């Protein structure tokens, strides 16, 4: 990227960064260059505490923080005094596991390198240090590490490699079929198997391009390196006049009539406030400190904004995003995949649920999807999307199993919606836009700068880009389900000459239906494993980041079969 020269490596590299690099250069880059943090079981569950502390060990240690400008390393070091006086010391690490039985000495290279780097820091500051100590709490054994010349040379070379990686701002390639990935909690961020598969394909969209072709549509069975769904869930506050307060480690939501409910903050992924709902400052600050976003909507469901503590530290991704957005050709290449995927998913929804659909409609949608994938301009792509949308919405009403004319659907309308179906569609599109906004922000993107939707004041263009392929799969599917299952009826809506509004109780039903859909596990059409739709959004966002960074050639839209 053109701005790379303006981003310099840190003057001092943490010694723990060297152990991360020794274990997996890609994990090191994700953690230190992109600012993503997740405790890695394989690298650190059998390793030292996150800060290298040995406070809970029986060793007589004192902890100091030293830097070595000449070496270019800084570290928090646990010191054990040797027999040679106060300047004769040993660096020490506390491990939660036990010595490795499969290797000589019982200590893996990442920890040997970290200890050696600490010793070099000590030596530059006038200490004597020829060996280190690792205490394994599970087995209560202490293992000595000698700082011989080969280890010192390996450590110095690794310092140079880490500095070069930080200066180049290029993510190292993922490991291939490595056992290290199996228990690494960076798996959902790194996506090693997914990236390796896509890099093997000449065309990142080719496997997803086949609508009926069983060969092209065949998925690969990849390792499940990411959780299938989140343990944390969104919390929605819809009742007007409600207040949200902090109560210990919980949030208390109190309605206007005095009824109160609590939810543990550890279980919350995001807090969504609709209309006239107030939140106290202590509650807001606590959520900010926990990096839990607070999202504000109008009473009608229009997404207004977000309150969040610190956003992603991945400035490299945002710089590359702005570079891509300025390049119309590269932006168009992304937009083609997104819109083509959207049209294919529209076709799938109709094919599955409209049993009387003319074959001509499916053929035309397939043609439009192909044309979108090869569009030569934004104007042409907009035209193709518009024609496909008109055809799709002309058949969407056929999916509704109701004889009530007031619940019929004859086409898309909005601002204000003039029938209940369109009212629910608009409401769900607002929730889905919020979901994409939060996901993109967490990955490190700027949600207001898109590639297909052009920048406009207050419009989350990239969130709208990402949600295109999920409109039929999530929002439209939920609408059909809610009306066909009689969860929503005419009495749930306020129908006037000016438009249609959703009643308060109906909004709860809509949100519940949306959350059921987002929590549904689906087999990924390309990678073969089962994950929830909410997790799919994150995977797609991270794949988009891999395209922006140059790791994979094309964006693989999520298309079901």
Feature names for model-found ranges:
Residues 80, 267, 273-348:
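A surface-exposed, charged beta-strand/loop segment in the N-terminal or early-internal portion
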Residues 38-42, 197-211:
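Short cysteine/histidine-rich metal-coordination sites, predominantly Zn2+-binding motifs
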Residues 23-26, 179-192:
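Local cysteine-cluster metal-coordination motifs and their immediate loop/turn environment
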Residues 1-68:
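Charged, glycine-rich intrinsically disordered N-terminal tails and low-complexity linkers that flank
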Residues 46, 63-67, 209-247, 254-256, ...:
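Active-site helix-to-loop segments that bind/position phosphate- or nucleotide-bearing substrates
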Residues 57-161:
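Mg2+/Mn2+-dependent nuclease catalytic core
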Residues 107-133, 290-294, 430-438, 472-477:
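Metal-dependent nuclease catalytic cores in nucleic-acid-processing enzymes
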Residues 13, 160-182:
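Immediate flanking context of iron-sulfur cluster ligation sites
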């Amino acid at each position: 990227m053109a701005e790379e020269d303006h981003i310099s490596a840190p003057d001092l590299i943490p010694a723990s960064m060297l152990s991360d690099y020794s274990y997996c250069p890609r994990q090191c880059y994700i953690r230190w260059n992109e600012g993503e943090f997740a405790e890695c079981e394989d690298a650190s569950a059998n390793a030292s505490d996150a800060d290298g502390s040995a406070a809970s060990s029986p060793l007589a240690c004192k902890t100091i923080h030293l830097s070595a400008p000449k070496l270019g390393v800084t570290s928090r070091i646990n010191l054990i005094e040797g027999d040679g006086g106060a300047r004769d010391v040993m660096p020490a690490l506390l491990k939660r596991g036990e010595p490795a039985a499969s290797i000589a000495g019982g200590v893996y290279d990442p920890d040997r390198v970290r200890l050696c780097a600490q010793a070099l820091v000590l030596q530059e500051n006038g200490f004597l240090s020829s060996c280190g100590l690792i205490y394994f709490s599970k087995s209560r054994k202490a293992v000595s590490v000698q700082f011989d010349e080969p280890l010192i040379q390996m450590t110095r070379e690794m310092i140079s490699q880490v500095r070069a990686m930080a200066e180049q701002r290029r993510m190292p390639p993922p490991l291939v079929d490595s056992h290290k990935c199996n228990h690494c909690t960076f798996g959902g961020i790194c996506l090693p198997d997914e990236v390796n598969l896509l890099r093997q394909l000449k065309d990142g969209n080719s496997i997803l391009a086949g609508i009926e072709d069983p060969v092209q549509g065949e998925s690969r069975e990849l390792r499940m390196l990411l959780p299938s769904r989140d343990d944390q869930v969104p919390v929605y506050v819809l009742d007007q006049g409600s207040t949200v307060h902090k109560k210990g480690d919980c949030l208390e939501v109190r309605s206007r009539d005095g009824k109160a409910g609590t939810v543990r903050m550890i279980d919350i992924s995001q807090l969504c406030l609709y209309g006239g709902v107030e939140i106290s400052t202590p509650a807001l600050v606590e959520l900010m400190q926990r990096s839990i976003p607070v999202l504000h909507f109008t009473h009608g469901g229009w997404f207004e904004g977000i309150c969040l503590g610190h956003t992603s530290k991945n400035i490299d991704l945002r710089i590359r995003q702005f570079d891509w957005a300025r390049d119309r050709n590269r932006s168009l290449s992304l937009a083609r995949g997104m819109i083509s995927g959207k049209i294919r998913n529209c076709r799938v929804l109709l094919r599955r649920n409209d049993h009387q659909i003319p074959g001509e409609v499916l053929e035309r949608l397939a043609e439009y999807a192909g044309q979108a994938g090869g569009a030569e301009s934004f104007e042409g792509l907009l035209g193709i999307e518009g024609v496909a949308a008109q055809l799709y919405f002309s058949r969407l009403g056929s999916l509704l199993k109701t004889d009530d004319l007031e619940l019929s659907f004859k086409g898309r309308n909005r601002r204000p919606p003039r029938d209940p179906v369109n009212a629910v569609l608009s409401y769900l599109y607002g929730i889905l836009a919020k979901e994409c906004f939060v996901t993109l922000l967490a990955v490190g993107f700027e949600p207001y700068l898109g590639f297909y939707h052009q920048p406009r004041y207050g419009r989350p263009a990239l969130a709208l880009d990402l949600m295109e392929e999920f409109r039929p799969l999530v929002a439209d599917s939920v609408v059909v389900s809610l009306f066909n299952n009689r969860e929503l009826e005419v009495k749930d809506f306020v129908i006037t000459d000016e438009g249609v509004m959703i009643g308060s109780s109906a909004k709860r039903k809509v949100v519940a239906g949306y959350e059921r859909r987002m929590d549904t596990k689906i087999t990924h059409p390309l990678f073969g494993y089962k994950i929830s739709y909410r997790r799919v959004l994150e995977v797609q966002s991270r794949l988009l980041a891999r395209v922006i960074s140059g790791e994979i050639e094309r964006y693989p839209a999520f298309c079901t079969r």
